[in-house]
Amino acid sequence: MEVEGALKLVGEMGIYQIYLSFLLAVLLQLYSATEAIIITILGATPPYHWMNDSLTANGSRGKQYGSQLPAEGEHGHVVFDGNFTSIVSEWFLVGGAAYEVSVSSSVYFGGVLIGVISFGQLSDRFGRKPVYVTGLALEVVFAVMNALTPIFPLFLLTRFLVGVMNGGMSLVAFVLLNECIGASYWAAAGSLGSLCFAVGIAQFALIGYFIRSWRLLALLVNVQGAAVLALSLCIPESPRWLHAQGRLREAQESLLSLGRRNRRKVTSFTLCPRQKDSAHSANILTIYSNAILRQRTLIMMWVWFVCSLVYYGLTLSSGDLGGDIYLNLALSGLAELPAYPLCMYLINHKRVGRRGSLAGFLCVGGGACLLIMLVPGKTGSGPLSVLNSQTLSLLGKLNISAAFNIVYIYSSELYPTCVRNLGMGVCSMFSRIGGIIAPFIPALRFAHWALPFIVFGAAGVSAGLLSLLLPETLSAPLPETLADLRGAPYRRLEPDGEAMLHRPQAELGAFTNGSSEEDEEEELDAVRECQALI
């Protein structure tokens, strides 16, 4: 019996898996979102003026929002007038030093870049649970250090380390949850996590509204992380990972444990051993020496890069709207919420599926960004008054949020279990490169006001078109090994493809191109080449 069949016996989404979903897709994502966007408040610039002429850095008079916070020391000529503190007022990151706020954001995503690729390989080797728990514990520690750091260089270092842990453990937690539930619930779990990430942005804005000291704010948000860590100590290891590693007894015990916690009366069963094609030695060569994985990976790397670039680029650009920073941040998160129910409906619709939804959201989001250059301001009164740069930017944010949600789910289904975490880590690595670059894209407006949106739009449309070259995974069984990639059930499904999945293996041979024995031998040769390269 395969793992998927065993999960049907013990429960694909029972009581305990609902608890795991609440822990890893709700509570954890609320905390992860906080650490990911915390710099939007910690790095906010309070209104200020120069004591010599009461003028702000750009030559306009500063606004009074609350008690004055005069600067001290060598920066004593600066007076901050806001009713909140930030790293800007702490270390005087104004004027020529203002760029250092963007650097702190890029440093974080640089850490995430390291985390997603290194944690992927670590969890494939040492297990999902120990790598996830260790990463979460270290993130809480480094985040507390970040709140207490006395100097800006140490602040940058701890932000980098928080990024490493946040990016790495979030990816592993996502895979761990998916490998503990039935494949038919992967989309729901992924959408729930993305939904809670958006809620986490609004939650952080609410907390920041009441806590105006950046140090106290950065410290208290880790209470949630510590609570999630305590609850994570008792979760099981992934049965799919144990099975892929050839640890059949432990995999069976893990599945039986899920059954008991789901209150299922499960009879004994025996898992079939799997080919040890790359379970113990998978690395980047395993992916790029396989033609199918290589094509999928190259396309998905660009898609992940674009999703991150446009998502964070539009988020940072929303800061130019003016008004209350807490309200703007909350709306930025809440604006994503409509994307997820729509996304859930479309990715499970047989006429759209994963591939069609991803391509559609990317193209619509990119098209909205391109339209901004045609309507830079308000278009007047009447129905067309809603067609302005702010509305189109919000539409782009909504669509790219949906695409970001789909790309996690879709990537999980494109890779076999033996390299799933590694493959997602490689793709997610390029997403973080997009995050590193994103803080600097809005600065292109100094060359031409529409240039940032042209970049976002062109990137989104190109990624959407390229994603059409990928296979559809809706209703297809999850591949476990490299050999499964060439099996008929894993090929692109036709309208009646779902029915084909239940036909005997002998009948499936009629739907393949060429001899199935030749395909299997070719795949085994590829596996041997991978092992030889390692």
Swiss-Prot record:
Positions glycosylated per UniProt: 52, 58, 83, 513
Compartment(s) of residence: Membrane
Zinc found in the keyword field: no
Gene Ontology annotations of biological process type: monoatomic ion transport
Residue ranges crossing the lipid bilayer per the database entry: 22-42, 97-117, 136-156, 161-181, 191-211, 216-236, 297-317, 327-347, 356-376, 391-411, 424-444, 450-470
Membrane topology recorded in Swiss-Prot or TrEMBL: Multi-pass membrane protein
Main location: membrane
GO MF term list: transmembrane transporter activity
PROSITE patterns attached to this UniProt entry: MFS
UniProt cross-references to SUPFAM superfamilies, sorted A to Z: MFS general substrate transporter
Gene Ontology terms: cellular component: membrane
InterPro entries, per database record: MFS_dom (IPR020846), MFS_sugar_transport-like (IPR005828), MFS_trans_sf (IPR036259)
Keywords, ordered alphabetically: Glycoprotein, Ion transport, Membrane, Transmembrane, Transmembrane helix, Transport
Protein family per UniProt: Belongs to the major facilitator (TC 2.A.1) superfamily. Organic cation transporter (TC 2.A.1.19) family.
UniProt function note: Probably transports organic cations.
Listed name of the protein: Solute carrier family 22 member 15
Classification lineage: Eukaryota, Metazoa, Chordata, Craniata, Vertebrata
Gene designation per UniProt: slc22a15
